Amino acid sequence: MFTMKKPLLLLFFLGTISLSLCEEERNADEDDGEKEVKRGIFALIKTAAKFVGKNLLKQAGKAGLEHLACKANNQC
């Protein structure tokens, strides 16, 4: 009876270690996926901010030039 317990205990121990390693790999893969998504969202926000910033600067520049032209001609 005791001789049967040793191999079973060894199999259980090896199976537990194997399962633990698989779970660690799976968790590492899931973490990498989250980082990629975060980078993707950040890039999208960054691009949108650049686009909005450029358009606001163009509009502000046009308004500023119109105001300067108005002041120069004293038509304000």
From Swiss-Prot:
Keywords tagged on the record: Amphibian defense peptide, Antimicrobial, Cleavage on pair of basic residues, Disulfide bond, Secreted, Signal
Indicate the family of this protein: Belongs to the frog skin active peptide (FSAP) family. Esculentin subfamily.
Q: Signal peptide span per the entry? A: 1-22
Subcellular location(s): the record lists:
Secreted
**Does this UniProt record's set of keywords contain Cytoplasm?**
no
Its biological function? Antimicrobial peptide.
Q: What is its main location?
A: secreted
Q: Which residues form the propeptide?
A: 23-37
**GO process annotations (BP):** defense response
InterPro entries xrefs: Frog_antimicrobial_propeptide
Q: In which tissues is it expressed?
A: Expressed by the skin glands.
GO cellular component entries: extracellular region
Pfam families, per the entry: FSAP_sig_propep
Q: What is this protein called?
A: Esculentin-2MT1
- Which organism is this entry from? Amolops mantzorum
Disulfide-bonded cysteine pairs: these are 70-76
